Amino acid sequence: MVRLIVPRGMTLEAARAAVAARDTTATVDLNHFYQPQSDNKSGCAGKGCALVREIVGWPKGDAAGCAKPHRIGLIDTAINADHVSLAHSRLEVIHLDEMEGKSSGTQHGTAVAALLVGASGSRVPGLLPGAELIAVDAFRRSGGSIDVASIYDLVRAMDLLAQREVKVINLSLTGPANAVLETTVKVAAGQGIILVAAAGNEGPNAKPVYPAAYDDTIAVTAVDKGRNPYRRAVRGDYIDIAAPGVGVWTAASVTGARQKTGTSFAAPFVTAAVSVLISNDPKMSLESLEAKIRQFTDDIGEPGRDPVFGWGLLNARSLCESGSKDKPSAP
């Protein structure tokens, strides 16, 4: 992969066309930027909001059917690995080299990581405590408090995780369509890597966002504790599944915990479910995985697949119970 500087006086579009004309076999596009999908407002108030994960029946602790997940990959911002909820987790954080600008903040990455693998005895018990999580910090701080990841760094991050034989990657980020990203997503799918992507928080009437809108990803939207769609979630025919994403209890960046809202925090529920499903069959294709996970959804919208909830709301209780039944009994 090559990153080029645009000559002075030439537009980005002209530069892209010129490079593409030099080699018609190359995939050429702009170095777009992508952002995490969290909302500063919790979107939840009152007693019981922190227990929003219970609407999908996610078991507490190491439930038998969900106790042996496959290794998980995460591409996100920096992570506070010293947070009490992550202190004893099987977490590895990789920082990309040769990155420009200031380091990204730890708020988003820490929250997503803790939601996935936070210690079961902490204030932020993860969905899969004890699971191995390999996280790549692909973001940099831009414009004050905004964290962004370039296509160049996203591709490098996905390559790194592929080298580590990760079979499911959480992508709680969105941005514009990009030919290089699309090619990378297709290559990952061809390698048997399942990409779980946040649907986006740009609003119900927004245009599709990526990578969620690509066919080779699982696009996850968010719902609140009443199973209502998150008010800012992007809608579209590419939405695959819904999960809790409003008032989700997870780690704060430095210490303690707080409620978080956004499709960023719905995606980890599905990532965790995928990790469990592929633990017995790491070579499961995306097509087979999607057919399998549909068996563990509750249709809460229009009959069948719809642009608001996809196939429906993840039912973690039935997923874990199924996994428990599939395991051979002890002698």
Regions found by a protein language model. Give the residues of each.
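Protease zymogen maturation seam
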Residues: M10-S85, V308, A330
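Subtilisin-like serine protease catalytic core
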Residues: P59-I72, A78-E92, E100-S150, Y214-D216, ...
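Hydrolase catalytic cores
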Residues: L115-L116, V136-A138, K167, G245-D326
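Substrate-binding/access-modulating region of protease and related hydrolase catalytic domains
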Residues: A138-D215, N228-P229, R235, S253-A267, ...
